[in-house]
């Protein structure tokens, strides 16, 4: 095996000994044009909704200011 492959194998073995297991999931491609269009469409619906102020307050409350983190 190559040194990199050996390191990865040992790392995965350590994680398994700790009781962990690998999980693979498929997620939307946020760079895909269809994803961007749909995200924009949904954001416009939320912004135009009757609860826009409450929705924005919620987002603000759970958001992290990365400059302060």
UniProtKB/Swiss-Prot annotation:
Disruption phenotype: The mazE-mazF operon is not essential. A triple TA mutant (missing vapB-vapC, mazE-mazF and phd-doc TA systems) survives antibiotic challenge, suggesting the TA systems are not required to generate drug-resistant cells. However the mutant is more sensitive to oxidative and heat stress, and does not survive long term starvation during aerobic growth on complex medium. There is a difference in the level of branched-chain amino acids, which may play a role in monitoring the nutritional supply and physiological state of the cell. Induction: Constitutively expressed during exponential growth and early stationary phase, it decreases in late stationary phase; part of the mazE-mazF operon. Negatively autoregulated by one or both of MazE-MazF. Keywords: Repressor, Toxin-antitoxin system, Transcription, Transcription regulation. It comes from the Bacteria. It holds the Pfam family MazE-like. Forms a complex with cognate toxin MazF. Antitoxin component of a type II toxin-antitoxin (TA) system. Neutralizes the effect of cognate toxin MazF. In M.smegmatis 3 TA systems (VapB-VapC, MazE-MazF and Phd-Doc) may be involved in monitoring the nutritional supply and physiological state of the cell, linking catabolic with anabolic reactions. This is Antitoxin MazE. It comes from Mycolicibacterium smegmatis (strain ATCC 700084 / mc(2)155) (Mycobacterium smegmatis). The gene is mazE.
